[in-house]
């Protein structure tokens, strides 16, 4: 069995959540899958996953809802024997303005319940993340209301640019580019 890279987008299933800020991870993974001419289709009760065989990569979206995302990540890690260094979690980040993306190689959950679940199930903070900024000046200051709100029409251009940039970064990661180099390019470029 090849050593896979696992890229997991966090979000919540269902039409009700589809366009919310909290589903930024799903939005990025859907676009990344389409780049490789793939579509997510329920493959497991815990979530959906796809293989990019020629790149030894797995794309995944948990079906466990945000707060239990770690269940699926752990199942995938165990099932496909994926080293922690090859796990990349794509998630919304309320601390960053919409349009900002940042790689993080390890660390705390920063109050993100999906990341808390992944940390709990993997029993470590030692995994990679792509943090996708979703903060808006035009929505509620109440955290739950802000992350569960939909993107406004005035934000759609910024959203599109950020998704495109995220997909480009992840494609380069899948193709073997070093995380440090990607950090330097996308954090400053």
Swiss-Prot record:
Single GO BP term: rescue of stalled ribosome
Q: Where is the active site?
A: 22 (proton acceptor)
Q: Which residues make up the annotated site Stabilizes the basic form of H active site to accept a proton? A: 92
Keyword flag RNA-binding: yes
Q: Looking at the UniProt record for this protein, which Gene Ontology cellular component terms does it annotate, in alphabetical order?
A: cytoplasm
What is catalysed by this protein? Answer: an N-acyl-L-alpha-aminoacyl-tRNA + H2O = an N-acyl-L-amino acid + a tRNA + H(+)
One of the record's GO molecular function terms: tRNA binding
The cross-references to Pfam families, in alphabetical order and at most eight, read: Pept_tRNA_hydro
Predominant location category: cytoplasm
Per the UniProt entry, the Enzyme Commission number(s) are 3.1.1.29
Q: Which UniProt keywords apply?
A: Cytoplasm, Hydrolase, RNA-binding, tRNA-binding
Task: Spell out the subcellular localization from the entry.
Answer: Cytoplasm
Question: How is this protein organized at the quaternary level?
Answer: Monomer.
The record's similarity note reads: Belongs to the PTH family.
The record's function comment reads:
Hydrolyzes ribosome-free peptidyl-tRNAs (with 1 or more amino acids incorporated), which drop off the ribosome during protein synthesis, or as a result of ribosome stalling.
Q: What is this protein called?
A: Peptidyl-tRNA hydrolase
């Amino acid at each position: 069995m090849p050593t896979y890279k696992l890229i997991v987008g966090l979000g919540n299933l269902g039409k009700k959540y589809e366009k919310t800020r909290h589903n930024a991870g799903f939005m990025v993974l859907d676009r990344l899958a389409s780049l490789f001419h793939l579509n997510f289709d329920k493959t497991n009760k815990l979530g959906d996953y796809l293989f990019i065989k020629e790149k030894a990569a797995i794309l995944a979206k948990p079906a466990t809802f945000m707060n239990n995302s770690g269940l699926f990540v752990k199942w995938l890690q165990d099932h496909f024997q994926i080293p922690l260094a090859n796990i990349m979690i794509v998630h919304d980040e309320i601390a960053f303005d919409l349009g900002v993306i940042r790689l993080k190689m390890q660390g705390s959950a920063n109050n993100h319940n999906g990341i808390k679940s992944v940390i709990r199930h993997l029993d470590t903070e030692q995994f990679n993340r792509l943090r996708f900024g979703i903060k808006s000046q035009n929505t509620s200051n109440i955290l739950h209301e802000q992350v569960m709100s939909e993107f406004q029409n005035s934000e759609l251009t910024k959203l599109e640019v950020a998704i495109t940039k995220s997909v480009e970064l992840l494609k380069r990661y899948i193709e073997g580019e070093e995380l440090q180099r990607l950090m330097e390019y996308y954090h400053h470029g």
